[in-house]
Amino acid sequence: MATETDLEELRRGSELVKRGFAKMQKGGVIMDVVNREQARIAEDVGAVAVMNLEAVPADIRKRGGVARMADPASLTGIIEEVSIPVMGKSRIGHRKEAEILQAVGADMIDESEVLTPADDEYHIDKREFTAPFVCGARNLGEALRRIDEGAAMIRTKGEAGTGDVNQAVHHQRNIKSAIRKLEGMDYEERDMWARDHEAPRELVHETAEMGRLPVVNFAAGGIATPADAALMMHHGCDGIFVGSGIFGAENPEAMGRAVVDAVNNHDDPERLAEIASNIGEGMQGDPNADLPEDERMQDRGN
């Protein structure tokens, strides 16, 4: 059995170690939480980790303004409350927010488009940190650029806070389709693809040879029901992030437990039917097609 020291070493250190910690979350559900009470509920219903932020994405959309890193005291309080990993969000390009999150003990940092970007041109150099990072991607080029910067986990961007899974599906299909195309290319064609998509050529070749991303790939953005979670697992995701879909639901405990069960039984329709029954209404959603262009969080970062 791993000791507390062993787990700490798995969380922090070399690229291999950081990727290893991220891989430990594979097959699980990571839930957004804004306080200790929500974190405790998430742990009780089976989340493998929680993501702390000052407001869930749906509420960030409603209130507008600048969305920033949560109060570090919120994260430390949650760390004291639960035994599962606790993650925190920083703004894209905001190195100091990431340094603060690392300093207070975040197990992983999400350089997230859900928050207002601090830098429109550059992401954080994640290789310089000991804490692992997760980043969003809409396509394979974005995913490989984030991995080259040091991301230990990729997630679909989707369209957070909408309750509409459409864009998460689209992004996952984009990534899988591009990988299949790379697998059918020869060495020179892969080099050309890397140039055309501004992707690191070594990672392009590694991805083609593996037939998948070299890091774990989770689904995120608009996942609001057990069926949504099962769908993303069907499309080959390694796990699920759920934001507004849990605590925006009528019965967060029932919804959270159902999403976890759906991930574990995503290939069993009869079991999924049982899981999805009598859990209360899900969050109120907004179709992605109705979003004004300036409200599309997925377009932040490149």
Curated annotation (Swiss-Prot):
Question: What are the positions of the active site?
Answer: 89 (schiff-base intermediate with d-ribose 5-phosphate)
What's in the keyword line of the UniProt record?
A: Lyase, Pyridoxal phosphate, Schiff base
**Enzymatic reactions:** aldehydo-D-ribose 5-phosphate + D-glyceraldehyde 3-phosphate + L-glutamine = pyridoxal 5'-phosphate + L-glutamate + phosphate + 3 H2O + H(+)
Q: Which domain of life is it from?
A: Archaea
Matching SUPFAM superfamilies, A to Z?
Answer: Ribulose-phoshate binding barrel
| An example molecular function term from Gene Ontology annotations | amine-lyase activity
**Keyword check for Lyase:** yes
Q: Which residues bind D-glyceraldehyde 3-phosphate?
A: 173
For biological process, the GO terms are: amino acid metabolic process; pyridoxal phosphate biosynthetic process; pyridoxine biosynthetic process
Q: How does it assemble?
A: In the presence of PdxT, forms a dodecamer of heterodimers.
Q: Which NCBIfam families match?
A: PRK04180.1
Q: What is this protein called?
A: Pyridoxal 5'-phosphate synthase subunit PdxS
Q: Which organism is it from?
A: Halobacterium salinarum (strain ATCC 700922 / JCM 11081 / NRC-1) (Halobacterium halobium)
The UniProt gene name for this protein comes to pdxS
